[in-house]
Structures are given as structure tokens and as C-alpha cells.
């Protein structure tokens, strides 16, 4: 089973703050133009090099999710971690990595007592997302426009899903949301293309770090080249908002990200 990326719409692209025009998709979005982490692979040990290069050259086949679940989860990921600013050749394969984790049974080593196993949680959660979409818009999630999809996901973020009550009694909404987001972030930022985006020079072993003073790039890294941009007009993610739910969550540390 393959995953196809649809055409990019102008209203899903980040906007240049000065011109007001959409910023076209590029091979490497972010503030580190021209930086290529894989260019440092000769400094890594063989085992590390094999693991990292495989993330680019060998995308896992879909073996856990059904075709319908892949289509739905891909649409969800397109809103949680949009990649419209990347050209088609440099999209990071999030769904295949989640699928591979579930198929091979990898987990963190613990499970909340009110949560089903991760695979079951995903199947239920995806059904729940579609139920909320149909309750709010009388259509499947994949049939909605981006500006309609975000409010559906927002109800999960706030632990107030509008629809699918029976499903959410089996998988707590806030727990599922954290599972979904943590898997998405893990898959995205484990990929060398994401490292290029944030200027991360890759594994330090066996070379080690040289610039131990705070905020300074290593000799093989590049200086940050910031520019002004605004979130896409269809996005609701321009600022951090506290999670809803029964379980306490801390706000993340750090600066605002790239687009």
C-alpha cells in the first residue's frame, strides 16, 4: 500500500509577512538553508549511519492499518504536522513509521490503566475522529476542508469531542490525543529532513561536541537565518493553547518553531 500526497493548496501554505504571499514549497523549509545532516554521515559509526540513512531510503511498508485507516490518519497528520511547505520529494513519512511501531509491537514499556493497547486505541480513536466530523459537519473527516478539519481535532485537544460518545468511553480522548501527538512528533523529528529544518547536526558519537557554550553551532552546522512568516490562513495553530482534559499537562519549553 502506498501513500500519495495530494496537491498543495495556496491557503495551506505559510505566508511571507512582508509580501503577504504564500511561501512556495521547498526541499528544505526552516531557518538553515543549505544545511544537510546526511553530509556528516562519514563521522558516524556504521550502526548509527545505517539506522539514520534507512529512515530516508527505506520507508516501512504499511502492514498494520487498513487502507481506509491510512487515508484517514494521513489526513489527520496533514493538519497536526502540516508539510505543505515541503516539496513532494522531501515529505517526511509519519504514518508509515507509526504503522511500523504498531505492527512490530514497540511501545514505551507502560500503558495507562484506562487505555486499551496502542493498536486498539488507534483504531478506536480514528473511528472517533470520523464520528466527530460527521456529527459536526455531516461528512467524513477526509471530505472536509482544512478549516473544517481543525475544529474537529480541536475538540480532541480540549477533551470535548462532539460525537462518538460510545467510542470515547473506550479510549479517553485526552490520552488518545497525547498518544497521537507523541507518535507524530517522534516520527517527524527522528527523520534527517527534520534535522535539516531545525539545524541539528545529527548524532554526536563518536565525534563528540566541540562548542559547549550555549547557543553556538558546531563547526559543521550553520548559523540560523530567521525570516518573518505567518501561519497559513486555514491554520488554528498560530499560538500555543493549554490542553484540556482530566490529566494535568505542562506547557512546552522553548521558542516558536519554523513553519
Where are these regions (language model features)?
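Active-site-adjacent bridging/hinge elements
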Residues: 47-48
Amino acid at each position: 500500500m502506498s501513500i500519495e500526497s495530494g496537491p498543495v493548496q495556496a491557503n495551506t501554505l505559510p505566508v511571507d509577512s512582508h509580501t503577504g504571499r504564500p511561501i512556495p514549497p521547498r526541499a528544505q523549509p526552516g531557518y538553515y538553508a543549505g544545511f544537510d545532516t546526511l553530509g556528516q554521515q562519514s563521522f558516524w559509526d556504521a550502526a548509527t549511519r545505517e539506522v539514520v540513512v534507512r529512515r530516508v531510503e527505506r520507508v516501512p511498508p504499511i502492514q498494520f492499518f487498513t487502507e481506509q485507516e491510512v487515508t484517514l490518519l494521513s489526513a489527520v497528520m496533514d493538519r497536526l504536522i502540516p508539510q505543505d511547505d515541503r516539496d513532494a520529494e522531501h515529505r517526511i513519512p509519519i504514518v508509515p513509521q507509526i504503522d511500523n511501531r504498531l505492527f512490530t509491537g514497540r511501545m514505551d514499556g507502560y500503558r495507562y490503566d484506562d487505555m486499551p493497547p496502542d493498536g486498539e486505541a488507534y483504531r478506536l480513536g480514528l473511528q472517533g475522529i470520523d464520528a466527530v466530523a460527521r456529527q459536526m459537519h455531516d461528512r467524513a473527516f477526509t471530505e472536509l476542508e482544512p478549516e473544517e478539519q481543525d475544529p474537529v481535532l480541536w475538540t480532541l485537544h480540549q477533551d470535548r469531542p462532539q460525537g462518538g460518545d460510545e467510542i470515547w468511553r473506550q479510549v479517553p480522548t485526552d490520552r488518545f490525543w497525547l498518544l497521537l501527538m507523541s507518535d507524530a512528533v517522534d516520527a517527524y523529528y527522528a527523520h534527517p529532513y527534520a534535522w535539516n529544518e531545525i539545524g541539528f547536526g545529527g548524532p554526536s558519537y563518536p565525534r563528540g561536541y566541540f562548542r559547549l557554550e550555549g547557543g553556538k553551532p558546531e563547526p559543521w552546522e550553520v548559523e540560523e537565518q530567521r525570516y518573518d512568516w505567518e501561519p497559513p490562513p486555514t491554520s488554528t495553530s498560530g499560538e500555543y493553547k493549554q490542553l484540556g482534559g482530566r490529566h494535568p499537562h505542562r506547557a512546552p519549553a522553548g521558542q516558536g518553531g519554523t513553519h
